Structure formats: C-alpha cells, structure tokens
C-alpha cells in the first residue's frame, strides 16, 4: 500500500515496451526510473546505505563479470544489505524468508528506458511467505525500502 503509492510497478506480461521489445518479468518486482547514469545512481545507493548505517553484505557487478568472460551486457549491479535486528524478526516469523535476505537492490541500464532500480516488493514477499503485513519488522522494511529508493532515484 505505502510502497504501491510511491513506486511504479512494472507489468510487462509479455507486452511490448515503448521501443517494441517484448519484456518479461514475474510478480514481486518493484521498479523505479532513476536520474543519472548507473555509476551515479550506484554511488548514491552506497552512500545512502552508509548514511543510514545499514551494513552492505556484498555487491555484484554483472556487466564487469560479463566483460571478463568476453561478453557484453548493459551496466547492471546488485547490492545486498540489511540489518540483522530487523531481518531476524522476519526469519523467526517464517524461517524460509531467509531465501530473500539479505535485501537487495539492482541498478541497471535498461535499453530504451534508462537507469532503473529494481527491488523486491515487500508486501508480495509477505503474502508469499504468509507473514502478517502489520508485523512491525515488515512495516519497517517496507518503509525503509521506499525511503532508500526515493533517495537513490532522486525523488
């Protein structure tokens, strides 16, 4: 609800994009256009996490890995992050939600659309794992992800 009002949901459902490409995705994804290059937006993400004192667990630069394999793909990076004080409560509620933690955000250059932020839809995850949407740790996570995406994408 909170996130839905602030973030655009992508519903590709095999529909052509603006440029006529057919794109596919699954439920549970929230996306948001961001101002700036992948590098600029990525740096804003890392700085935002640091400012909010959220531990960065890992990063993956898929484009760099592709180049190392002699391949090309648009700039695409993933940040894995989270606070155990929040995520642990979710895992105590439903241990299998550990598959979704730590949280992650993808920053990617999408041809024809520009720099995009992709992240899990927290309410969808709650439904998937049968977690009460009113659970305090879930509400904190929902608000946190909206705050981070707003700061990172320049809203």
Q: Where are the predicted features?
A:
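Compact, glycine-rich, soluble single-domain proteins
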Residues: 58-106
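Beta-strand/loop substructures that line and gate deep hydrophobic ligand-binding cavities in soluble
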Residues: 104-131
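Well-ordered alpha/beta subsegment
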Residues: 128-155
């Amino acid at each position: 609800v909170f996130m839905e009002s602030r973030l655009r949901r992508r519903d590709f459902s095999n529909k052509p994009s603006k440029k006529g490409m057919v794109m596919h995705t699954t439920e549970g994804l929230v996306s948001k256009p961001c101002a700036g290059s992948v590098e600029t937006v990525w740096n804003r993400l890392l700085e935002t996490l640091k400012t909010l004192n959220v531990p960065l667990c890992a990063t993956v630069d898929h484009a760099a890995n592709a180049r190392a394999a002699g391949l090309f793909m648009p700039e695409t990076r993933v940040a894995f992050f989270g606070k155990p004080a929040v995520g642990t409560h979710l895992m105590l509620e439903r241990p299998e939600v550990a598959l979704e933690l730590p949280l992650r955000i993808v920053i990617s250059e999408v041809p024809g659309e520009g720099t995009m932020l992709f992240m899990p839809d927290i309410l969808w995850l709650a439904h998937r794992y049968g977690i009460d949407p009113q659970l305090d740790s879930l509400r904190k996570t929902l608000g946190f992800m909206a705050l981070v995406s707003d700061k990172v994408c320049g809203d």
